[in-house]
Amino acid sequence: MKNKNFNCITTLFMTLAIVITSCNNPSKEAQGSQTINKENMENEKLLQFGKQYAAAWCSQQPDSVAAYFSPTGSLSVNANTPAVGRQAIAKVAAGFMTAFPDIIVVMDSLITKPDATAFHWTLTGTNTGPGGTGSKVSISGVEMWQLDTAGLIQKSKGSFDADEYNRQLKVGVK
């Protein structure tokens, strides 16, 4: 009887030791899945960042857009001179927000590349700001982001079809 109890207790302790060791030293396969989950989490954070950035453009608060940039960040649109620093970026955002009081910016997609993140967007609104034409506009474009170590935009190079934009300002959306 003592021998059976000893065997049961020994087996129990060995099983417990294996379980504890396994929990403290995950297999390579489990470690790989942790890496994938971490990568997915980072992608999810970036996707959320993009959605919130688009929402900031809709807020009629230019400083909300600028807050997504590093304090020394830059924004250039269609290869024009970059706006550098949050105050200058807020001025660019204010220009669009004033021209389109009903501005809606939607994130169409966010594509992570080795050298940049591509933020694809569509802007819709009615040009009813001061000196506006009253025309409705719907234009799509992209910003190529370089992010800093804090996860803010350090550099954004934006582009959209300026000829189509100007046509829509005159006669509206097709």
Q: Locations of the language-model features?
A:
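Short beta-strand segments enriched in hydrophobic/aromatic residues
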Residues: 69, 123-125, 160
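Bacterial N-terminal signal peptides
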Residues: 11-20
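Hydrophobic pocket/interface hotspot
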Residues: 53, 65-66, 73, 85, ...
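Bacterial N-terminal signal peptides that target proteins for export
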Residues: 2-10
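A solvent-exposed, acidic/Ser-Thr-rich amphipathic alpha-helical stretch
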Residues: 43, 62-114
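Short, low-complexity N-terminal intrinsically disordered segments enriched in polar/charged residues
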Residues: 23-71, 172-174
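Low-complexity, intrinsically disordered terminal/linker segments enriched in charged
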Residues: 154-174
